[in-house]
């Protein structure tokens, strides 16, 4: 009997450490790698035109197997006591699910949240989860098994008692899981730890006695490299960090270094070693295997802003390799943003602007060909539509600093973009996706036409074109809308010749505001922007049928 027990123990050891190499996850799922699609349904309802079916087709063509969709449900509901989820939110989720199902990709519906450095998890989060998740499960329970739920992204209470906060979250998560199971008993559900989804807090989770769980953690180690210069962290003063560690390449500590800066800088050689980066992965594999569960890392990445491009690619090559060796499902953060798969955040044409070395390092395909530009398509069709009935075509649309919807409809009218509770200088962008030469249109007498409706006499709105940030500085040519329509709550048509737009200056995060200097360039236009003035605006405005007319 003793021999049989020893033999069984040896077989289990080999399962965790095959050929005495890296331990491997025993429970496998039919997907292994994917990408996050943030911003679309995060933090604001004004980004719903940022992606479309073509983007999902592009993502699939890379070899992506699973898409994680962060949904900030706290802004996509009608508030206490029922926290009723917005119909528009469900429409967006169902579109994403339809596209993923058609394309053969898995979809993670992630209950996302505010994760800025100074944020903390909503103290009422349990009530919200217990109301929202049954609604989501009821709506999605008949979808295919390719749809996966994630209880919540990066919970982080700030009581000062970390161990207590982690235990508190574990209990809340268990209750949310019960609420989901009451409606959708068999669905795959992702669970994670209560300290920003850290690996250590995942290891502290109780056994929820559920066979359809995926245990999850996030991995941005070594933090000094991945988040160097990030303005939302305590590392905003530290840049030029090498990876791997090199004493000769290390920058000096900033003057009057904080305790956080000094700790990260001093420990970087050890923190960036392969031993320190891989040992936690082995612990996670052992933990998941004991639970008989799959294991996922559904956020990892490096900000492209300050990291050396080659060293950044090398980090991804190593991280992906280490996770693949252990059969850990990996879902990178993100797609088009600062941690994304493109060479920059300002130019995201597919496939021209993809970071080919990065894709190769991550085991993805590098597509050939050229994207269809909005301008070329408009010239071919003869219709320079920018926004029509909620559709932006090949353009990306997004906004900030206001409430509203990009697909608002009332009484059966065509869809419009609706904005209210508008903060000073808030803006709504139509991004052309590449620098467009509109100089011939300007010389030919082209004009911007649209319909607008507002009853707000305090509205101070302007419209401007912005030229490309790939130049030294992004300049603006603007036209004020003050006095061009009546604040009577009725739809009115506006027509503004390009010749009425004047060089007013420009702004960049690096240089701040500069007054106009006659440098605006009509040959490299990258966006059209509606912007509020210096005063807040309560009632706001609606706009529709935006186009360039010749």
Which ranges hold each PLM region?
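Positively charged n-region of N-terminal signal peptides that target proteins for export
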Residues: 1-4
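Bacterial N-terminal signal peptides
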Residues: 7-16
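Active-site mouth of glycoside hydrolases
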Residues: 25-188, 193-202, 212, 339
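A cross-family glycoside hydrolase active-site/sugar-binding cleft signature
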Residues: 36-38, 68-72, 108-112, 150-152, ...
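Short, solvent-exposed loop/turn elements at domain surfaces
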Residues: 40-47, 223-226, 396-397, 505-506, ...
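Active-site region of glycoside hydrolase catalytic domains
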Residues: 130-273, 278, 282-302, 325-326
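Aromatic-rich peripheral "rim/lid" segments of glycoside hydrolase catalytic domains that contact
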Residues: 305-381
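Beta-rich carbohydrate-recognition modules and glycan-binding surfaces
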Residues: 372-550
